[in-house]
Amino acid sequence: MENALVDLKARSLGVPVYELLGGAVREELPLYWSHCGSYRLPRTAEMLGVPPITSLDDLVSLGKEVREKGFSALKTNIFLFEEQPHMHQPGFARSEGWPALNPERRIINSLKEQLAAFREGVGPELEILLDLNFNYRTEGFLTVCRALDDLGLGWFEMDLYDPAALARIRHALKTPVASCESLFGLRGFRPFFESQSMDVAIVDVPWNGIWQAMKIAGLAESFEVNVAPHNFYGHLSTLMSAHFCAAIPNFRIMEIDIDDVPWKDDLVTKPPLIQDGMLKIPEGIGWGTELNEEAIAAHPVKNTGDERKYDRGMG
């Protein structure tokens, strides 16, 4: 509701939203290809109509694609190439590894192979970010991250609700830690900043609202912490996050999902402009686009009947 009202206010003044936030301090935003490979695992790939990833060689090829399209970073999840390639995500649902949330040695070994394949594909310059989600507890995160700490990753991303536990993990590692995408409001973030729990604070702009997100970014700056938006949604969210990133000084990098349904661009009147892995700051008034109601109506939500079958995750 807040973001809709801010859009209306900006439109009434004939300005982009970022002008209401103090103006843009940059004209384009570096992007990282989020969930890289996740949506190309067999079950999801079929829904999107793209060739499925079934081997480490496929990850090498995907890494080359990321590099060739100009992105400066990618973020991946935990994949297991077993009977059927799938995501390992015990922190989200009743699946393998839940509820104990303890990493097995085979998971760590598989992760090393996965990250090595991506590194071979992207080359030495691009950043690789690893999202561990809610998949472990403090001990498990430490076990996994220590085993991967010498790989030169851009960050480990993880979610914990205890700021002291997250701070303990961060101070035990060389690799930066990103977190807090699931937090809401200034008061939710404050104890994590006070505990020096993360290097990069991930802020969800649609969920928090643009004004609250700006306050969180301001508080982060006072603790010398960079900010990155949580943006695995659609184009409207991407544009909201772009205005946010344009206006804050302590911006790190912006998340975006590249693999998606082929009609995604049809849902808005003006999709985000991406060139060589960079997002151009929207120039139109308000958020810079409008919803295409006809296109939305043409693609209603479908109940596939398997929404609660989490045994093999997204794969």
What positions do the PLM features span?
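Conserved hydrophobic beta-strand within the GNAT/NAT acetyltransferase core sheet
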Residues: T76, I128-L132, S179, P229
